[in-house]
Amino acid sequence: MDWKIELIPVPVTDVDRAKAFYEKVGFNADHDHRVHEGLRFVQLTPPGSACSIVLGDGITDKTPGTQEIQVVVADAEAARRQLLDAGVEASEVDVQPWGNFVYFGDPDGNRWSLQAIASRPNG
């Protein structure tokens, strides 16, 4: 049986600011619903991903700025250019034997690693 990750909660201080930031990065806003007083559910999906992030009011007790997420991209330099073109501060490409990485953070300090994998063992 396959197990597939669906949602990763991202703690934020300002839901509207965070939603606008992730849309600027290129995420699709799938849902934005106030379920009830104290619970707002905002689901955003990175381009080409089957896994989404969720942010909102009443979503997580984690402290904003403490989440770290790593995703795979086809080309680290192209991903970096996309971030810079969107006005997002991004690191230089970090070249490692197991892949190339680009790092950026959201307005609350949650950290993202974008990895272009050199190769995977067993395919």
Model-predicted segments: where are they?
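Short, basic, helix/turn surface patches
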Residues: 56-64, 116-123
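Short, charged/polar, Gly/Pro-enriched secondary-structure boundary elements
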Residues: 49-53, 109-112
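Short, charged/polar surface micro-motifs in flexible loops or helix N-caps
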Residues: 47-51, 60-62, 75-78
